[in-house]
């Protein structure tokens, strides 16, 4: 919102990368013992995080809205797109993340995936609305899902498979929390920009230019910031075999050794299933069932993100410190249910905001 068979494809194209060899530089720092988390790396990580979250928010919400508004109002099309891209992203994260662990190039093991991933991510975000040009409608739906699936593959490879692993590579226990926390802020900033401002942008320039702008931002930031990331060049041969490393993750012995962790993952999966049942349809619901304009829909969501997401983050953190994680997590489930119930039966803007605040404020708890 998190690397993939496109692994063979990446390996095939790594050799012809001479067209941007000058772009991805192998600096002396990469071979030295100097800290990798320099100021330029910090800035690059923040910008890559922001660009990724902007593009993800657009894909997660406005691809669906565009499909409904401009290709077909059949919600089945949106459901298929959400389901297929979720599977693609999951497979991509696992397979391409493992592949990046084993990659050895003069540019590092993570940067090629981040560079290529952000490039394709941005280009396909910009190209997505072209699906509406295809007729009949079934072909347009197919092209939209195809674009989104390819985009999701490269996006998950770049962000979840490679960038997340890169952050682990270049941080330590003493500074990892700050980096992750800063990237979390970038996520909320991106949410505020997209969910709060997208309606205004779309109203002013239309869907097509909206996608062109967001896609352009992701592409440019990927092209500029990825070469600024510093990475130690590894020459040792990767241990074990590729598919064996993936299989080891799902062995029964691994489940037994990490029992509590997998219980947590199962709980989180069930919780996120509930979230993703409704969240991809949020803007569609506000526009087509509550009958709010696209600007008013954006304002409702933007206010809730500003207050319930960004504003409530610190107080909830204090609450977690005082009560502990488990009580706050249980409270969040209860308030989520209440908030969604209020949201689903409300037709007035104040009640919609109240309901959304209840489920949004504790969604990160």
Please state what every model-predicted region is.
Residues 26-38, 235-265:
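Juxtamembrane intracellular "pre-TM" segments in multi-pass secondary transporters
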Residues 35-65, 258-278, 357:
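Pair of pore-lining "gating" transmembrane helices in MFS-fold secondary transporters
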Residues 61-77, 280-296:
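Short amphipathic helix-loop junctions that connect adjacent transmembrane helices
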Residues 89, 177-202:
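Glycine-rich segments within core transmembrane alpha-helices of 12-TM secondary carriers
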Residues 93-106, 311-324:
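Helix-to-loop junctions at the C-terminal end of transmembrane segments
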Residues 111-127, 327-342:
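Structural signature of the two symmetry-related core transmembrane helices
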Residues 124, 131, 137-158, 351-365:
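Hydrophobic core of transmembrane alpha-helices in multi-pass small-molecule transporters
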Residues 326-365:
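C-terminal transmembrane helical hairpin of 12-TM major facilitator-type secondary transporters
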């Amino acid at each position: 919102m998190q690397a993939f068979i496109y692994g063979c494809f990446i390996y095939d194209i790594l050799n012809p990368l001479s067209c941007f060899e000058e772009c991805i530089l192998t600096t002396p720092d990469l071979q030295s013992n100097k800290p990798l988390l320099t100021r330029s790396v910090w800035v690059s990580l923040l910008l890559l995080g922001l660009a990724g979250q902007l593009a993800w928010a657009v894909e997660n919400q406005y691809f669906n809205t565009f499909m409904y508004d401009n290709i077909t109002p059949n919600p089945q099309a949106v459901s298929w797109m959400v389901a297929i891209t979720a599977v693609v992203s999951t497979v991509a994260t696992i397979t391409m993340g493992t592949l990046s662990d084993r990659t050895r190039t003069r540019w590092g093991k993570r940067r090629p995936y981040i560079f290529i991933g952000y490039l394709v991510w941005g280009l396909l975000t910009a190209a997505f609305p072209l699906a509406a040009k295809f007729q009949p409608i079934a072909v347009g739906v197919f092209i939209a899902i195809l674009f989104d699936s390819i985009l999701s593959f490269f996006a998950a490879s770049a962000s979840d498979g490679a960038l997340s692993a890169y952050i682990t590579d270049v941080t330590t226990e003493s500074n990892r929390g700050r980096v992750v926390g800063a990237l979390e802020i970038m996520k909320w900033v991106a949410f505020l920009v997209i969910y709060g401002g997208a309606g205004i942008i779309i109203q002013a320039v239309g869907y097509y230019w909206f996608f062109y702008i967001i896609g352009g931002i992701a592409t440019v930031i990927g092209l500029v910031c990825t070469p600024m990331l510093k990475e130690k060049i590894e020459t040792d041969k990767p241990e074990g075999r590729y598919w064996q490393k993936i299989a080891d993750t799902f062995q029964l012995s691994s489940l037994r050794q990490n029992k509590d962790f997998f219980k947590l993952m199962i709980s989180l999966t069930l919780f996120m299933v509930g979230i993703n049942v409704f969240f991809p349809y949020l803007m569609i619901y506000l526009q087509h069932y509550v009958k709010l304009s696209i600007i008013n829909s954006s304002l409702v969501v933007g206010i809730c993100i500003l207050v319930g997401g960004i504003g409530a983050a610190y107080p909830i953190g204090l609450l977690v410190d005082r009560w502990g994680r488990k009580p706050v997590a249980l409270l969040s489930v209860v308030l989520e249910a209440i908030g969604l119930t209020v949201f689903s039966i409300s037709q007035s803007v104040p009640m919609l905001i109240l309901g959304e605040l209840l489920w949004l404020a504790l969604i990160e708890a």
